[in-house]
């Protein structure tokens, strides 16, 4: 065998070896004291024929029994928000310490509510342009809902081919907010495309499902929460006939009533109506954590620890709304829920009851439209003998739950959300 041929064979082996171990184990994170008490892997999966799209992920093994525990793929909303927010704010094993930024790396602390105590979780930055995900070349096609479903499915297939020990684990897809448009069709795509994946179901928090319906339900929600008067609500019902989004241009009375309504709620924090509508750069603001995460993710030592490719992106932003051109080509995901129900997949749909962006009334409405019988009627679910929310189960293996006092995402009530998840994923009653 010639030296040239031997060299080429060696090169091929090295390339294949590199691709087979594209993830990197992270044992230390800037801001966290000592070695991480869990196993974290970060890396990229190339998507497309030339792998021009590089999707970044964080993978955390279950702290209980990773060989047998469920595998969960977690998607954040937006579209365009990094899954790092889910990891550090909602359901991960570490969180940013809430303290005033002093110029150094923001501190990380261990959490007690991590979903990784009972599941392996892949936190995926998607679509391309979110978090640390990027494209090596300009995209030919505009990013879209249906396009992302296919990209994420390709990601999952390639990720599992490099982590084959997780093929047999019960598999779930989860997310919140805008991922309500992506997760149901993704479940359908996985179900029809790859029977090797042990797909069991999906989990959605405050899911955007039908934007027009959700906006219309904000008005009865506002009335129920004493944000508008009985008189205004009844007038809006009568004159606008329940349609507050696509109003007839000749219905001037309805337009006036909507203006009166907007005066009542324009300074409201719709993501959690009990919290102030405040500047996130102020340490007094609950969402000051969004300022801290921006400092943390843009720190050079953090990027090095996470093995982020140098020069791949500029400034990390929590939600990259400005730079992602997006085609919202799925107008409603209700039909996908119906198909997933027919196919027998389990689902947990939960709502923070103080979220006005996706009011629980809207979620209940589309669940009713599936027309499945109730198997376990409306009742409180409890933690330490206290009401944590309310729940109802249906014959299509769907469980609906509210989280009392929570807002648009799990970060508002992480402990309660974690307990709810633990019970559901273990097939126990909430």
Swiss-Prot record:
Stored SUPFAM superfamilies: alpha/beta-Hydrolases
Leader peptide range in chain numbering: 1-22
GO biological-process terms attached to the record: proteolysis
Glycosylation sites: 102, 299, 323, 371
Catalytic residues of the enzyme: 177, 355, 408
UniProt tissue specificity: Expression not detected.
InterPro entries recorded: AB_hydrolase_fold, Peptidase_S10
Gene Ontology CC terms: extracellular region
Localisation: Secreted
Keywords: Acyltransferase, Disulfide bond, Glycoprotein, Secreted, Signal, Transferase
Keyword Magnesium attached: no
S-S bridge residues: 81-319, 240-254, 278-285
Recorded catalytic activity of this chain's protein: 2 1-O-(trans-sinapoyl)-beta-D-glucose = 1,2-di-O-sinapoyl beta-D-glucose + D-glucose
Molecular function in Gene Ontology: serine-type carboxypeptidase activity; sinapoylglucose-sinapoylglucose O-sinapoyltransferase activity
Chain segments annotated as coiled-coil in the UniProt record: none
E.C. designation(s): 2.3.1.103
Keyword Signal included in the entry's annotation: yes
Described purpose of this protein according to its UniProt entry: Catalyzes the formation of 1,2-bis-O-sinapoyl beta-D-glucoside.
Family: Belongs to the peptidase S10 family.
Protein name: Serine carboxypeptidase-like 13
Organism expressing this protein natively: Arabidopsis thaliana
């Amino acid at each position: 065998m010639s030296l040239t041929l031997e060299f080429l064979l060696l090169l091929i082996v090295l390339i294949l070896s590199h691709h087979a171990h594209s993830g990197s184990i992270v044992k230390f994170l800037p801001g966290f004291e000592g070695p991480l008490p869990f196993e974290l892997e970060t890396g990229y999966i190339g998507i497309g024929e030339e792998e021009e799209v590089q999707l970044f992920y964080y993978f955390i093994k279950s702290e209980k029994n990773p060989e047998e525990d469920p595998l969960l793929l977690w998607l954040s909303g937006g579209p365009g928000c990094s899954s790092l927010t889910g990891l550090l704010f909602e359901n991960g094993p570490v969180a940013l310490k809430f303290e005033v930024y002093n110029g150094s790396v923001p501190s990380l602390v261990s959490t007690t509510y991590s979903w990784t105590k009972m599941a392996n979780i892949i936190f995926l930055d998607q679509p391309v342009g979110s978090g640390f995900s990027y494209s090596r070349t300009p995209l030919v096609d505009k990013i879209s809902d249906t396009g992302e479903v296919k990209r994420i499915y390709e990601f999952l297939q390639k990720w599992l081919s490099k982590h084959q020990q997780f093929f047999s684990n019960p598999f779930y897809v989860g997310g919140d907010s805008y991922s309500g448009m992506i997760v149901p069709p993704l479940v359908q795509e996985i179900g029809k495309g790859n029977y090797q994946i042990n797909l069991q179901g999906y989990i959605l928090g405050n899911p955007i499902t039908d934007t027009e319906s959700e906006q219309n339900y904000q008005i009865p929600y506002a009335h129920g929460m004493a944000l508008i008067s009985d008189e205004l609500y009844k007038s809006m019902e009568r004159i606008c006939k329940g349609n507050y989004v696509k109003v007839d241009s000749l219905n001037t009375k309805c337009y006036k009533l909507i203006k009166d309504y907007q005066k009542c709620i324009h300074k409201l924090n719709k993501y959690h109506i009990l919290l102030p509508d405040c500047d996130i750069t102020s340490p007094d603001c609950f969402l000051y954590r969004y300022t801290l995460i921006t400092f943390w993710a843009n720190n050079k030592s953090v990027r090095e620890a996470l093995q982020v490719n140098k020069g791949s992106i500029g400034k990390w932003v929590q939600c990259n709304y400005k730079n992602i051109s997006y085609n919202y080509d799925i107008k409603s995901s209700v039909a996908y829920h119906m198909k997933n129900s027919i196919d027998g997949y389990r689902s947990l749909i939960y709502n923070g009851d103080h979220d006005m962006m996706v009011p629980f009334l809207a979620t209940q409405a589309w669940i009713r439209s599936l027309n499945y019988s109730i198997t376990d009627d409306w009742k409180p679910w409890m933690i330490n003998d206290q009401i944590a929310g309310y729940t109802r189960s249906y014959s299509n293996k769907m469980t609906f739950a509210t989280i009392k006092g929570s807002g648009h995402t799990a970060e508002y009530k992480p402990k309660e959300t974690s307990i709810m998840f633990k019970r559901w994923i273990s097939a126990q009653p909430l």
